[in-house]
Amino acid sequence: MARRRAFPAFALRLWSILPCLLLLRADAGQPPEESLYLWIDAHQARVLIGFEEDILIVSEGKMAPFTHDFRKAQQRMPAIPVNIHSMNFTWQAAGQAEYFYEFLSLRSLDKGIMADPTVNVPLLGTVPHKASVVQVGFPCLGKQDGVAAFEVNVIVMNSEGNTILRTPQNAIFFKTCQQAECPGGCRNGGFCNERRVCECPDGFYGPHCEKALCIPRCMNGGLCVTPGFCICPPGFYGVNCDKANCSTTCFNGGTCFYPGKCICPPGLEGEQCELSKCPQPCRNGGKCIGKSKCKCPKGYQGDLCSKPVCEPGCGAHGTCHEPNKCQCREGWHGRHCNKRYGASLMHAPRPAGAGLERHTPSLKKAEDRRDPPESNYIW
């Protein structure tokens, strides 16, 4: 790996904005053959201090000269400026050597101003062999102006368990935070974070936390004013304004769904479901299910359920008089009107003066069989 140059002329500026991991120190007796590297890449350096060059912090396990005297540096070290929210460091274990790290402490000492520092890697792990970024974040809460003190304590060991690098014990760093101002302010207990965005408490949302969240949502134009509480418009009530307060009654099983409006069952219409869609009433127990359309009970058919059904019909010599009852024409009888009177006596001698016997129509019960239904008959 190519060596990166250290820049002693930048030391004072680095102390003012890079106080955390730059204060790593090497343990006494560190072996010279270690292959651990830590640096700030050119892009991050340009963002932080305006110079686009890599800034070396640790090379072959050894600290850059400008990071050695921590106590003197801490005495003159100002707080991290308001506009610096995080810093990126790049590290790498070159060759085959294995290094293990542990963040022993990430703690804010002024939690009303800044939350605990954050890192984008596990708190315990191995230094990667491929150059990788470690980001340390300084999360100001935006609730008030002030300077927050915090700790970042990390240790790096080799595969034999020897400490290679560590932050000094009881090292305290500082971050300047500012009370954020969100345009329009934050309502309902929300607070403006350092990005000037309102963070809303549970149950509220919106750019200013001005909207309450009701589950289920308010219906029929209801307004959610606090979490779970709807103000209903006139004519509605219920937890989520789902019920209508009808001033009129819905007849015939209709249901009021809006003030003055009813949902009518099939076959009925009108503002109060008082009108049938069938101009003439359905007969024999039939029910109106649409405009001029009846649903007939078993045994009847027709537009108005006025025609009885005989199963299996009355043949050519009878008519269906009642459900399953045939009325036979003169001279015929039987369940289906298919038997003729006197058919067996046609060739027998008749008494003198005797005439043909006239029979009155008779009612006979038919067997079970269905006739084709009419086109508008619904079984």
Curated annotation (Swiss-Prot):
Q: Give the signal peptide range.
A: 1-28
Please classify the protein's predominant subcellular localization into one broad category: secreted
Which organs or tissues contain this protein? Expression highest in heart and lung. Lower in brain and eye.
Q: Which residues form the EGF-like domain?
A: 178-210, 211-242, 243-271, 274-306, 307-338
Bias regions of kind Basic and acidic residues — which residues?
Answer: 356-373
Q: Name one GO cellular component term.
A: extracellular region
This entry's Gene Ontology molecular function terms read:
Wnt-protein binding
Which residue stretches belong to region Disordered? 348-379
Q: Where is the WIF domain?
A: 38-177
State any GO BP term from the record. Answer: negative regulation of Wnt signaling pathway
Keyword vocabulary terms for this entry: Developmental protein, Disulfide bond, EGF-like domain, Glycoprotein, Repeat, Secreted, Signal, Wnt signaling pathway
Pfam families linked to this entry: EGF_2, EGF_DL_JAG, hEGF, WIF
Q: What does this protein do?
A: Binds to WNT proteins and inhibits their activities. May be involved in mesoderm segmentation.
Complex and partners: Interacts with MYOC.
Question: What is the protein name for this chain?
Answer: Wnt inhibitory factor 1
Q: What is the lineage of its organism?
A: Eukaryota, Metazoa, Chordata, Craniata, Vertebrata
